[in-house]
């Protein structure tokens, strides 16, 4: 039972119709790790500056997140600023400051190299490729990406795609990557490139999971109060892989159940700004919402 998550730890400045928050803790690695920690003890890999809150590092420890792979450097942590309108699926990037990520090359501690599952969260595809050289025969490798990397490093994306089992990306990114408007055709194109699964995140409409012999759709939990959608996709990936790491099985029913747990974690993450909701979330709440999902799709 071993899940390694390689991703960003950052400060986010977020403006939504429901409010504004300046320099709150976020980042793909942060959301993925906290979501996964409800099922397993993930190991995180990333870099932060001296300004990163010690309280969050204590939170990781309390949740069983292994931080041996977390590097603290002199300087400022990664900072992203973005704006959301009333459509939570659309966001505008105002500013990105990479700070301590300048020149960063992740190095896995020896204890991380035998991981069963590796998640290459939303980082530079060249860094994702570096990680794959360092791991030894994982059972499952997943990657996430974004339109920035698809547009600027398409060859690197395709190179990494050939080496992974799962791609997580939203519908816009899937279409951009394949130049296909139809998501089913797009999913088949990506499967032909190497991965065994394509998980297409569709925001408030849930997600589609494409396998070579099946397609599975999962709802997004109906939510009246969408406060901050920033960490939804990363929380989905963390919940999905955290559950698979817990059970150590990868059958079609297991994949379907993992997708529902991913959607459950995402539905909680959006209820407050940043990681605040994940900090107060309980196993009891997760179980109750999972059962509610079953009722939503039963007929």
Identify the residue ranges that each predicted region occupies:
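Extreme N-terminal starter segment of soluble prokaryotic enzymes
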Residues: 1-4
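Conserved N-terminal subdomain of the carbohydrate kinase-like
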Residues: 11-23, 38-120, 132-138, 287-299
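Alpha-helix C-terminal capping segments
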Residues: 33-42, 243-245
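Short beta-strand scaffold segments in enzyme catalytic cores
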Residues: 34, 80-83, 206-210
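Short, conserved phosphate/pyrophosphate- and ester-handling motifs at nucleotide-, phospho-/glycolipid
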Residues: 36, 170, 233
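A short acidic, amphipathic alpha-helical/loop segment
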Residues: 56, 127-134, 155-159
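Conserved phosphate/ATP/ADP-binding segment of small-molecule kinases
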Residues: 136-140, 147-217, 225
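Conserved phosphate-binding/catalytic region of the ribokinase-like
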Residues: 183-299
């Amino acid at each position: 039972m071993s899940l390694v998550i390689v991703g960003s730890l950052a400060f986010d400045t977020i403006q939504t119709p429901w409010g504004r928050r300046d320099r709150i803790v976020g980042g793909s690695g942060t959301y993925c790790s906290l979501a996964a920690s409800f099922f397993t003890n993930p190991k995180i890999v990333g870099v932060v500056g001296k300004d990163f809150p010690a309280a969050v590092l204590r939170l990781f420890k309390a949740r069983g997140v292994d931080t041996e792979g977390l590097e603290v450097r002199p300087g400022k942590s990664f900072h992203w600023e973005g704006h959301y309108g009333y459509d939570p699926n659309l966001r505008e990037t105002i500013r990105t400051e990479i700070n301590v990520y300048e020149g960063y090359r992740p190095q896995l501690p020896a204890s991380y190299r035998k991981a069963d599952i590796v998640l290459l969260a939303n980082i530079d595809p060249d860094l994702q490729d570096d990680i794959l050289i360092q791991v030894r025969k994982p059972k499952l490798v997943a990657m996430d990406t974004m339109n920035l990397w698809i547009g600027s490093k398409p060859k690197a994306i395709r190179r990494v795609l050939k080496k992974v089992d799962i791609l997580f990306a939203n519908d816009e990114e899937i279409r951009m990557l394949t130049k296909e408007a139809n998501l089913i055709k797009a999913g088949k194109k990506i499967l032909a490139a190497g991965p065994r699964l394509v998980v297409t995140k569709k925001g408030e409409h849930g997600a589609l999971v494409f396998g070579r012999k099946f397609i599975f759709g999962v709802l997004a939990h109906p939510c009246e109060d969408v406060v901050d959608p920033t960490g939804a996709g990363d929380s989905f990936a963390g919940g999905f892989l955290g559950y698979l790491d817990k059970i150590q099985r990868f059958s079609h029913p297991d994949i379907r159940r993992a997708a529902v747990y991913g959607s459950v974690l995402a539905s909680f993450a959006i209820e407050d700004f940043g990681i605040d909701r994940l900090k107060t979330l309980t196993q009891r709440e997760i179980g109750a919402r999972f059962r509610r999902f079953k009722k939503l799709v039963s007929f």
